[in-house]
C-alpha cells in the first residue's frame, strides 16, 4: 500500500518554474565584515531562478550594540538587503525579457531601482544613514 502511494507521488509533474534551492551562501566580500554579523533563519536559503542566484533575504540584526562600531551590523544588513533586492529585480527582468512565466515569489518585485533603506522603519533608517555618514567621515580623515 505505502509503496504504491510512494510510486504515485514520484510520478507527480514537476513545477513549470525554473528555480533551485541551495544552502545559504554569503554574498558580501570578506573585507565587508565577517559572516557572524549576519543572521538567517533555518530555511531562509538562496535560490537560483533560471541560472540567476538570489541570496537569502537578510533578517534585521538583533545584536547591535549602538556604540558606533567600524562595521555595524546595520550597515551589513543594509548592504545585504540592497544586494538581495538587486538580485530579485535581475531575476524578474530575466523572466520578463524571455517571456517566461514569472515565479509567484517574484511577481510583486518592482523593477524600479529604489534604496533598500526605504524598507526600514524610520528610526532605523536614520540610524543606518548616520552610521554610514560617520564611517565616510572617519575614512576621509584617515586619507
UniProtKB/Swiss-Prot annotation:
> GO terms for molecular function, please?
oxidoreductase activity
For whether the record's keyword set contains Protease, the answer is no
List, for all copies, the residue spans of the domain called Oxidoreductase-like.
48-93
Q: Where in the cell is it found?
A: Mitochondrion
Q: Per UniProt, which keywords does this protein have?
A: Mitochondrion, Transit peptide
Keyword Chloroplast on entry = no
Q: List the protein's name.
A: UPF0651 protein P31B10.02, mitochondrial
Species for this entry: Schizosaccharomyces pombe (strain 972 / ATCC 24843)
Amino acid at each position: 500500500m505505502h509503496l504504491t502511494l510512494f510510486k504515485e507521488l514520484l510520478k507527480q509533474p514537476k513545477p513549470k518554474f525554473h528555480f533551485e534551492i541551495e544552502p545559504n551562501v554569503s554574498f558580501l566580500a570578506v573585507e565587508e565584515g565577517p559572516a557572524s554579523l549576519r543572521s538567517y533563519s533555518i530555511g531562509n536559503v538562496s535560490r537560483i531562478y533560471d541560472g540567476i542566484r538570489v541570496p537569502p533575504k537578510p533578517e534585521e540584526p538583533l545584536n547591535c550594540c549602538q556604540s558606533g562600531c567600524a562595521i555595524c551590523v546595520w550597515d551589513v544588513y543594509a548592504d545585504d538587503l540592497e544586494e538581495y533586492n538587486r538580485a530579485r529585480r535581475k531575476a524578474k527582468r530575466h523572466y520578463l525579457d524571455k517571456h517566461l512565466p514569472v515565479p509567484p515569489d517574484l511577481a510583486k518585485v518592482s523593477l524600479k531601482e529604489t534604496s533598500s533603506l526605504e524598507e526600514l522603519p524610520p528610526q532605523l533608517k536614520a540610524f543606518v544613514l548616520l552610521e554610514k555618514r560617520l564611517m565616510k567621515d572617519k575614512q576621509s580623515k584617515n586619507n
